[in-house]
UniProtKB/Swiss-Prot annotation:
Belongs to the FLZ family. This is FCS-Like Zinc finger 8. It comes from Arabidopsis thaliana (Mouse-ear cress). Pfam families: zf-FLZ. Keywords: Metal-binding, Zinc, Zinc-finger. The lineage of its organism: Eukaryota, Viridiplantae, Streptophyta, Embryophyta, Tracheophyta. May act as an adapter to facilitate the interaction of SnRK1 complex with effector proteins, conferring tissue- and stimulus-type specific differences in the SnRK1 regulation pathway. Interacts with KIN10 and KIN11 via its FLZ-type zinc finger domain. Interacts with KINB1, KINB2, KINB3 and SNF4 via its N-terminal part. Interacts with HB21/ZHD3. The gene is FLZ8. One of its GO terms (biological process) is cellular response to hypoxia. Residues 15-28, 126-141 have a biased composition (Polar residues). GO terms for molecular function: zinc ion binding. A zinc finger (FLZ-type) spans 221-265. Induction: Down-regulated in response to mild as well as prolonged energy depletion. Up-regulated by glucose and sucrose.
Length: 267
């Protein structure tokens, strides 16, 4: 009896083991096929990432995507609009520049006035100096007509009166100041020498002056004697000049005169 029971238990255990093995085989069919497929898939992914097959391939990670999913790209309308906007702005700027560079209808004519072509309108000689300032306050320069004079470099004579304040503001005005015991100031306006008086100037030509104009040219006898010791100077004597209008017999006399003139200038 005991032997029969043990045999029946062994038979039941064997049947249960067979049924469990059959269930496991049904749940995991072809295990080797799946392991091979997974290893092949990982190898292809690594190979595709490391070395792309084409230069034009813009999707290096396309292998990692779901092969069964839909690869339809999304709509890119806002991106295309953003890309087109800079081009439109650039074309608008170019159009505006072209419109600015277009010449305006009608010729443009301009006149250029040089300093030597200006002339001052000088009124008639006034009766008093007070009337002169009132009349010449609103005077305006006139333009010279092209053919009114023979040439630009020719000396000209201006007759009349002119305020010194207006003359000093002109570009054609030059002032020469001479220092010494007899200081004087020479005003030159354009091509003319000016004779000055308080507040009013008189014009005269810059031609060589006559002997009677002793104020602006040294006398003919200034080389006949020394300005310091009054020694007479002959044609064969050495003459030492100072400031162009003073002659001396020696360098000592000239140095004395120079020291005296410097002392007078400092006072």
């Amino acid at each position: 009896m005991l032997k029969k029971r043990s045999r029946s238990k062994q038979a039941l255990m064997a049947e249960t083991n067979q049924s469990q093995n059959q269930k496991q085989s049904k749940t995991t069919p072809f295990p080797r096929l799946f392991t091979a497929f997974s290893s092949f898939k990982s190898f292809t992914e690594n190979d595709a990432v490391a070395s792309p097959t084409s230069i034009l391939d813009t999707k290096p990670f396309s292998v990692l995507k779901n092969p069964f999913g839909s690869d339809n790209p999304k709509t890119q309308e806002p991106e295309t609009r953003l890309k087109l906007e800079p081009k439109r702005i650039g074309l608008a700027i170019v159009d505006s520049l072209i419109q600015d560079e277009t010449p305006e209808p009608g010729p443009r004519s301009g006149t250029i006035l040089f300093g030597s072509q200006l002339r001052i309108r000088v009124p008639d000689s006034p009766i008093s100096s007070s009337d002169f300032g009132i009349k010449t306050r609103n005077s305006q320069p006139e333009t010279k007509k092209p053919g009114s004079e023979s040439g630009l470099g020719s000396p000209r004579i201006i007759s009349g009166y002119f305020p010194a304040s207006d003359m000093e503001l002109s570009e054609d005005y030059t002032c020469v100041t001479c220092h010494g015991p007899n200081p004087r100031t020479i005003h030159i306006f354009d091509n003319c020498i000016v004779e000055s008086q308080p507040g009013v100037v008189f014009f005269r030509s810059s031609d060589p002056v006559n002997e009677s104009d002793s104020d602006y040219s040294p006398p003919d006898s200034f080389l006949s004697c020394c300005c310091n010791c009054k020694k007479s100077l002959g044609p064969r004597d050495d003459i030492f000049m100072y400031r162009g209008d003073r002659a001396f017999c020696s360098s000592e006399c000239r140095s004395i005169e120079m020291m005296m003139s410097e002392e007078n200038d400092t006072k």
